[in-house]
Amino acid sequence: MIKKIYNQIRSSLPQKYQIELSKFVFRITDKPFFVNDENYDLKKGIVVVSADFELAWAWRYSKKKINISEIAERERNNFHIIINRLNELDIPITWATVGHLFLDSCKRENGKAHWDMYRPNYFENEYWKYKYGDWFDIDPCGNYKSDPGFYAPDLIEIILNSKTNHEIACHSFSHCDFSERNSYSKLIDAELSECRKSMDKFGIRPVSFVFPGNLYGSFDHLKKAGFKIIRYKANDSKELGYPEILKNGLMAIHDSIALDVYEDGWDNNYLLWKYKKYIDKAIDKKAICHFWFHPSLQYKQLEEYFLPILNYIHSQRENGKLEVLTMEQLITL
């Protein structure tokens, strides 16, 4: 209730004052908020990092005016910088990957891309508006060389061949809304099945799932499909803490905060300071901090706080203060 009122007040302000309000609240409260669980007794803090690896797929029905080709190109460029730094520092992360990226190519049949796949019904949510055409209209039905924003087997190979043991998780096949409001059983089952099928040729059997747009739902379908852990928090105020076991047996790990910021006006030095606070408190409480991000973040953000926060994670681990784990590795805690 308090958070809802806060969000209503914040959204009514000009953007400059929204940012100042966020800074003020962070300063006067005990943020980042920690929720304890006596079932866990960790020896040190843990940092988990998950990447929503999507290229053009996440943005095609965005309500914002976005050049999806530009975003996909930036993500490809950033990918090499990010993976090189992760491997240099030996920081494993979870790459939550859209299933279509595993394809070398695809083609139209019966006049449609992926004609045998179930489609979402028209819908509108907080982020996307899909009101006309076919869900796969944007699919170029080419290949990773002609249309690198829609296919990425070359990048998948780089992840798999890294000296650091990264995890590849499922992020659906086509980045659709998994909420009960905007999906249906056959659609969800098809999205999960097709994503697994696209991963098969790489020998990947994912156990972790990240919801597209962080739009939660279809938990029983995920359990039935063999997933073991999801990025999800039932307690919206929890920023640091421990995994939860849902009623159907799925493990859920909260996300703490996103490492990419879309509001203009933030000072990147402030953001670096803020992200360090999350790590420091996770160390102090011997809890889990779970960062997530889009690899398409702006290059200035990448340089000024994203890569520096990776360096900070590395230094704190080298000092024996924390561990770095993937989502999959949390299952055995």
Spans of features found by a protein language model:
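Catalytic alpha-helical scaffold of carbohydrate-active enzymes acting on polysaccharides/glycoconjugates
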Residues: 2-208, 213-251, 270-291, 298-333
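C-terminal amphipathic alpha-helical segment
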Residues: 255-277
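Short strand-loop junctions, especially beta-strand C-caps/beta-turns
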Residues: 256, 294-296
